[in-house]
């Protein structure tokens, strides 16, 4: 079974396939926030989407993080460290990339189990 959630004209924010949940790349909606604020907003949205799919941050398997400037990795990691389930750390990559909106400082994509 495949279930798609929060669809737009071009993508689904979350897709369930069997016991796996795939989240699209999530960016903050309030791009006036600093990197910590954007990261917090993104992680809150990840919590919401995972919950909608019957999952949680404790079941995150893999996470890809893009930052517009690698120097933002340190403040992003401060927020990440407060959020992540320390007993169930996912595989993770964090790289610098030019994001679609120049005001976006962070984008996070997650794969989780149920």
What are these regions (language model features)?
Residues 1-61, 67-114:
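N-terminal presequence-like segments and the immediate start of the first folded domain
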């Amino acid at each position: 079974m495949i279930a798609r959630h929060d669809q737009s004209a071009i993508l689904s924010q979350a897709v369930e396939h069997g016991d796996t949940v795939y989240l699209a790349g999530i960016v903050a909606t309030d791009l006036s926030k600093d990197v910590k604020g954007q990261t917090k907003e993104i992680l809150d949205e990840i919590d919401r989407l995972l919950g909608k799919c019957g999952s949680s941050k404790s079941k995150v398997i893999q996470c890809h993080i893009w930052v517009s400037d690698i120097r933002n990795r340190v403040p992003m990691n401060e927020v990440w460290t407060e959020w992540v389930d320390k007993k169930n750390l996912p595989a993770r990559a964090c790289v610098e990339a030019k994001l679609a909106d120049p005001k976006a400082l962070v984008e996070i994509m997650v794969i989780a189990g149920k």
